[in-house]
From Swiss-Prot:
PROSITE patterns: KH_TYPE_1. The gene is Khdrbs2. GO terms for biological process: mRNA processing; regulation of mRNA splicing, via spliceosome. This is KH domain-containing, RNA-binding, signal transduction-associated protein 2. It is found in: Nucleus. SMART domains: KH. Residues 218-231 have a biased composition (Low complexity). Residues 181-263, 321-349 are annotated as: Disordered. It comes from the Eukaryota. Keywords: Methylation, mRNA processing, Nucleus, Phosphoprotein, RNA-binding, SH3-binding, Transcription, Transcription regulation.
Amino acid sequence: MGEEKYLPELMAEKDSLDPSFVHASRLLAEEIEKFQGSDGKKEDEEKKYLDVISNKNIKLSERVLIPVKQYPKFNFVGKLLGPRGNSLKRLQEETGAKMSILGKGSMRDKTKEEELRKSGEAKYAHLSDELHVLIEVFAPPGEAYSRMSHALEEIKKFLVPDYNDEIRQEQLRELSYLNGSEESGRGRGIRGRGIRITPTAPSRGRGGAVPPPPPPGRGVLTPRGTTVTRGALPVPPIARGVPTPRARGTAAVPGYRAPPPPAHDAYEEYGYDDGYGGEYDDQTYEAYDNSYVTPTQSVPEYYDYGHGVNEDAYDSYAPEEWATTRSSLKAPPPRSARGGYREHPYGRY
């Protein structure tokens, strides 16, 4: 019988044997120890001398026991693997060692694990051992032992049964990132970490209105002279001389002065006088007065509209009345004639 198949078969028989067969179990255990001891002696003979001059690569392997018996409720395999196995991958990259989780409970499917363990194949012989981590290093002697020591120190941190340590918190953050359920992605705020901000409604008035003061506490007296409606906040009295804001629906705060309106540029800067000033300066009311005061013909002129209107209707607009007009652009002041009422010449139409 081959040595590769002999040890797995012994372990499989020991596990499948009923506990009532005490002597058979003892004999199987002695045979397993004897076989493992012989393999260990051969390996010790081969490793008796270490050649560091040639600097050849050597293979180191250590099996680190996972304390599942001391802490049966803690998931050490999940902590070692991490989200999608990334924790174990990073640990291998950092240490430069190959790590494998072997033994009972290393597979997720327990029924399949039992089938493979009973199959007797050499590659599944580790399923009969205790749950452990196999660390393998293949490198020159000095570097190989350095990597092994580093790997042992790092693997020790993962075998601490703590749910809230730094490793576990980092794995939870990575898991939330991989699942796309970050706080900023879905908007799920953590209790106690967010600050609630009350929204402020924009002012409807031009230039912005002053926000109303905070509501007074219960029992606070309102100022005299203010009207308080049910369900509305009391409005403080407005100081005399203070301009009120132009926004609708907001009350003025006493003592607040609205900022002055922005000073507009003079019209002179935009060149309005250049285009129209010269034309209106020449054609003032004096220019029109000359046409009425000094007629060009000796015969009196009037406009005959052909409606049978006589000259008496135009006598009220004598030329001497137009001579008293002002020479500015301002409209003439209204006449203060209170006595007679003058009929309009076009009143009949």
